[in-house]
Amino acid sequence: MIRQRTLKEIVKTTGVGLHSGRKVTLTLRPAAANTGIIYRRTDLTPAVDFPADPASVRDTMLCTALVNDEGVRISTVEHLNAALAGMGIDNIIIEVDAPEIPIMDGSASPFVYLLQQAGIETQNAAKRFIRIKKPVRFEDGDKWAEFVPFNGFRMDFEIEFNHPAIDSDEQRLLFDFSTQGFVREISRARTFGFMRDIEYLQSQNLVLGGSFDNAIVLDDYRILNEEGLRFENEFVTHKVLDAIGDLYMCGHAIIGEFRAYKSGHGLNNQLLRAVLADQEAWEWTTFEEEVGSPVAFAEPNMVLA
């Protein structure tokens, strides 16, 4: 059968919080089968847990943030969550000593490296997939996102930015998910923003950790980062990365096709909630044989460049 996965070892790293600008220590711990994905703030006494759940996403203004009933939050979870989805991790404890996950380089790549460093272990429990059974669509003005049945996990994402530095031919991406494809084609895409917005937000004591080290920064005419883009379609690729992380807030791999136009964290989350609220729209499924799975996860011991 296709089994659940966790980490072999505990791993730790430090980085900067995007919003606070302060040092954050991140620790990833193995967890027992059927634990799920648990985010934990260890700077509070007692520690506060945030199980991955689309209902826990209560703020999507500048990132994806989990907020509990007491108003305690943990922000900027989407890039790490995307790495967990990409590597097929089902069970993990994620500890931070701050109200946010460190931003690292603004992509999911450092988290992929961290997971590979920890090693991946299969567990004696079946991996549970969510299979989309019928179309579900969520709209907000001219923006929309939808799931339709598909025997695999496919992303069809289109953005619309009228900017000289964003090629009009590079604003749509079709991605058929596999671990190898995620690591090589998606994980390195960085978040992006406009200098005028960053300057305003920093004047409001927000995104104090934002810099050229962890984002693609644009003015009205060009990309300001000296090194430019990592690949030509990095903008839409990062939106796909964000969506993979947002959709994995259900804690399970999805079998279906996600289509979106100008979607963001909020719309991604609303679609996921709408799907899960409609019991006729999805079903649980497991696979007795690896070859039967329509979603291609790499072997646990495979090292991916």
From Swiss-Prot:
Positions of Zn(2+) binding: 79, 238, 242
Catalytic activity: a UDP-3-O-[(3R)-3-hydroxyacyl]-N-acetyl-alpha-D-glucosamine + H2O = a UDP-3-O-[(3R)-3-hydroxyacyl]-alpha-D-glucosamine + acetate
InterPro entries given in the database record: Ribosomal_Su5_D2-typ_SF, UDP-acyl_GlcNac_deAcase, UDP-acyl_GlcNac_deAcase_C, UDP-acyl_N-AcGlcN_deAcase_N
UniProtKB keywords: Hydrolase, Lipid A biosynthesis, Lipid biosynthesis, Lipid metabolism, Metal-binding, Zinc
Cofactor requirements of the protein: Zn(2+)
Entry EC number(s): 3.5.1.108
Active site: 265 (proton donor)
Family: Belongs to the LpxC family.
Task performed by this protein: Catalyzes the hydrolysis of UDP-3-O-myristoyl-N-acetylglucosamine to form UDP-3-O-myristoylglucosamine and acetate, the committed step in lipid A biosynthesis.
Protein name: UDP-3-O-acyl-N-acetylglucosamine deacetylase
Organism the protein comes from: Vibrio vulnificus (strain YJ016)
Gene name as annotated: lpxC
